A protein has these predicted regions:
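Histidine-/acidic-rich catalytic cores in large beta-rich domains
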Residues: 3-69, 88-92, 96-103, 107-507
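Solvent-exposed serine/threonine-rich low-complexity stretches and specific carbohydrate-binding patches
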Residues: 72-86
Length: 507
């Protein structure tokens, strides 16, 4: 079954399949009256979201559209649909949220500019899932009555499997609202461009762009020189900068490159080889490590292990390096990359030129141990040259390429892969580039995850934390009080990231 499913998804991720699906959809739609009393509805025409519906109809008057999905035993799911004009006479959208295998009653509400509304109801049995994920996640901490967790959907990014891989959408009640198959490996985050496309990785080789209806408009293969890993970001031109591994290297160094993918042509260019930028440090490390983006790789040299990239408006970039527990600022990434400064424990880089580039810690707090998901936050209330930076601090001290380094130099760090007492942390820094300092402005303990994991500040001020190796994700208030938490069964070792998206302007 898995081999057949893998082959099916491989076919979905081809231009021929997507074009064929487009043609079939247009033929079927043309045979329908597609009025509000007889809407054209079909399941997942592009094979990219198992439980979704494609809906098309016209109305005599201009209306906005919203819908509510109801299935017995589950909380209702309500969304306003995106339309280019708020009120329109032609309506075409992807409807999310059906419960697989159950009778779903969908109330579609049409509202005109005067606020007058009318509702049409359709019934549809939800499609069977392709994966084995739970429809209702376990609530390890249920939100108090009246607690507002905000809108949007949790995107589960990387519950890696040896079988078929997916990205999942769950609502704030822990109910499955979308199953997006990918080729293999994982999607690391969602990027939205100015043309209404959502970009994500579908394998170590593929970046794809999906439109609002679920069609894969662009499917780019990175080619034979590089594979992607861990993260990517969109630059000011709409191109995508990716963390990458250079294939075919004599030294087998991995996860130490940044490349750029042109979203208009699919061409790939190298931006920086950190092995060249930090040649002395690389040479000082032991040839060791693994490459989880290439399970067949042998004798890898994972001396830096970048796991996050953040692009800044001035052309600089921030990188998180797990192997050195360092945050690295690089200037002019796309033209002439040079080191600006580093944040973290300086003694890791002792004896190298880079050791003098560390910002000064201001205050009494611990540095990070293998941080993930660093996020740059500009704030208009801050003077020029200052910004906030938050992250998931794994608080795990280890380095296969620095086996003799004593990580206990970092106060409170754990050196145990498995521990009943260790905690990871959410941390937020204020970085003052003018003074050359960083200080901690917020932190709290979260469930221990020595590897992977993510943190995300939400629009409502709450903080979403994924403790990946525990299979736990939840929302906290700014004081670190846990408001709600869910547990997802792990397919193998961890859930790489969980980010929340409201998908406004898309679905």
């Amino acid at each position: 079954r898995i081999e057949r499913l893998n082959a099916r998804i491989e076919n979905v991720y081809t231009a021929d399949y997507q074009d064929m699906a487009d043609d079939k959809l247009e033929q079927e739609k043309s045979k329908s009256s597609a009025t509000e009393d007889n809407m054209f509805v079909t399941e997942d025409p592009y094979g990219t979201n198992t439980t979704s519906l494609y809906v098309y109809f016209t109305t005599d008057d201009a209306v906005a559209v919203s819908y509510t999905v109801h299935a017995d035993g589950y909380t209702d799911f309500t969304r306003d649909t995106y339309q280019e004009s708020q009120y329109s006479k032609t309506h075409e959208f992807q409807l999310l949220g059906l419960i697989p295998g159950e009778k779903n009653t969908v109330a579609i509400t049409l509202t005109d500019a005067d606020g007058k509304s009318r509702t049409h109801t359709i019934e549809h049995r939800g499609a069977s899932l392709l994966g084995n994920e739970k429809v209702q996640l376990e609530k390890t901490v249920a939100a108090d009555s009246g607690e507002d967790l905000g809108g949007g959907l949790y995107a589960i990014l990387g519950n890696d499997s040896d079988e078929q891989d997916f990205m999942f959408y769950y609502d704030t009640n822990g109910v499955l609202r979308g199953e997006i198959p990918v080729l293999y490996y994982r999607s690391h985050r969602l990027l939205f461009d100015d043309d209404g496309l959502m970009w994500f990785s579908a394998s170590t080789h593929h970046m794809v762009a999906m439109n609002r209806l679920g069609k894969l408009e662009k499917i780019y293969d990175l080619g034979s020189d590089y594979i992607l890993h861990h993260d990517y970001a969109m630059d000011s031109n709409g191109d995508i900068v990716l963390l990458a591994t250079k294939l075919g290297r004599d030294d087998n160094a991995v996860q130490d490159q940044a490349i750029k993918l042109s979203t208009s042509t699919g061409s790939v260019t190298r931006l920086v080889d950190f092995g060249e930028l930090f040649a002395d440090y690389k040479a000082s490390t032991t040839h060791a490590g693994t490459d989880e983006s290439d399970s067949n790789a042998k004798n890898r040299w994972d001396w830096l292990h970048c796991n996050t990239i953040q692009l800044l408006d001035d052309g600089s970039a921030l990188f998180s390096a797990r192997e050195t527990s360092t945050i690295i600022k690089v200037d002019d990434l796309e033209s002439d990359p040079t080191l600006d400064y580093m944040i973290g424990e300086p003694s890791v880089w002792a004896g190298t030129d880079e050791a003098s580039s560390f910002l000064t810690k201001s205050g009494d707090f611990s540095d990070t141990g293998g941080q993930h998901s660093i996020t740059y936050v500009a704030d208009d209330s801050l003077p020029d040259g200052q910004y906030y930076l938050y992250m998931f601090d794994n608080n795990f001290g280890t380095s296969l390429t620095r086996p003799d380094f004593d990580w206990t130099v970092i106060d409170g760090i754990s050196t145990e892969l498995s521990s009943d007492t260790a905690e990871s942390q959410y941390r937020k820094y204020l970085v003052n580039e003018n003074a050359g300092t960083y200080t901690e402005v917020s932190s709290f303990d979260v469930p221990y995850s020595p590897y992977v994991s993510s943190a995300q500040e939400l629009d409502n001020g709450q903080i979403l934390i994924d403790s990946g190796m525990k299979g736990l994700f939840g929302q906290y208030n700014k004081d670190g009080d846990l408001l709600a938490q869910f547990h997802m069964t792990l397919n193998s070792s961890y859930i790489y990231r969980v980010y929340k998206y409201d998908f406004s302007g898309f679905y």
